[in-house]
């Protein structure tokens, strides 16, 4: 049956469609932090995230990255290939910031000579713990070959994203990705890419991402609108 709610998330709801291999993602006007401990309704956020993520995924598709994105069908809705999500948050860091700086006692804003890929176990009850490759295998999340593919694909995506953001005057500090298995068992990029799941700084070091909400730095939608306008100007 189509249009049945499958899953309710922090930032979007997932619905079935007439095609069993396609789902509809509906972006919400909700901002959260600390795994949902703090929630706020922010009018217009869903529209902006849907537009930004759709634009990024269209460019990734065109660049040969296998993703779940099919098309944006309304201001807040998009169609995606149905995947079985791999319970990993894959974080890539180009610059020290956030939890990385706290964990290792280093200042924010230091360029990393080589981007660092980290894994976090997607489990709200455990507060998404930081894990390594051996934990991933122990938990039967992925094997060696799949882990290597996810890391390589994340680094490839990083190079594309860094270039695009540099072109519009933004520095890509870090980001979180999620992957899933499609109907053929192939690992593809899933979820979203928006300022909700990345850090972006402008030339003056101003936050152009969800840290505006986390750190009470101003209007989240004003910042997201600037990011969208810049991305729309990409060649």
Swiss-Prot record:
Leader sequence residues: none
SUPFAM superfamilies referenced in this protein's UniProt entry, alphabetically: SAICAR synthase-like
GO BP terms in the entry: 'de novo' IMP biosynthetic process; cobalamin biosynthetic process
InterPro entries named in the record: SAICAR_synt/ADE2_N, SAICAR_synt_PurC, SAICAR_synth, SAICAR_synthetase, SAICAR_synthetase_CS
One Gene Ontology term of the molecular function aspect: ATP binding
E.C. designation(s): 6.3.2.6
Family named by the database record: Belongs to the SAICAR synthetase family.
Protein name: Phosphoribosylaminoimidazole-succinocarboxamide synthase
Record organism: Streptococcus thermophilus (strain ATCC BAA-491 / LMD-9)
């Amino acid at each position: 049956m189509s249009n049945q709610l499958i899953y309710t998330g922090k930032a979007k709801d997932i619905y079935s469609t007439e095609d069993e291999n396609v789902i509809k993602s509906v972006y919400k006007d909700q901002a959260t932090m600390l795994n949902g401990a703090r929630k706020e309704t922010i009018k217009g956020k869903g529209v902006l995230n849907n537009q930004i993520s759709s634009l990024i995924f269209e460019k990734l598709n065109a660049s040969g990255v296998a993703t779940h994105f099919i098309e944006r069908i309304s201001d807040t809705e998009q169609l995606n290939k149905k995947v079985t999500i791999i319970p990993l948050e894959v974080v890539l860091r180009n610059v020290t910031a956030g939890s990385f700086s706290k964990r290792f006692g280093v200042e924010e804003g230091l360029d990393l000579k080589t981007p660092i890929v980290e894994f976090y176990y997607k489990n709200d009850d455990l507060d998404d713990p930081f894990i390594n490759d051996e934990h991933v295998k122990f938990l039967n999340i992925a094997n060696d070959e799949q882990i290597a593919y996810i890391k390589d694909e994340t680094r490839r995506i990083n190079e594309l994203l860094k270039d695009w953001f540099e072109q519009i005057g933004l520095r890509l500090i870090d980001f979180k990705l999620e992957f899933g298995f499609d109907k053929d068992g192939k690992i593809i990029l899933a979820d979203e890419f928006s300022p909700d799941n990345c850090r972006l700084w402008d030339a003056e070091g101003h936050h152009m991402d969800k840290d505006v909400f986390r750190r009470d730095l101003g209007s989240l939608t004003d910042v997201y609108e600037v990011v969208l306008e810049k991305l729309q100007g990409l060649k």
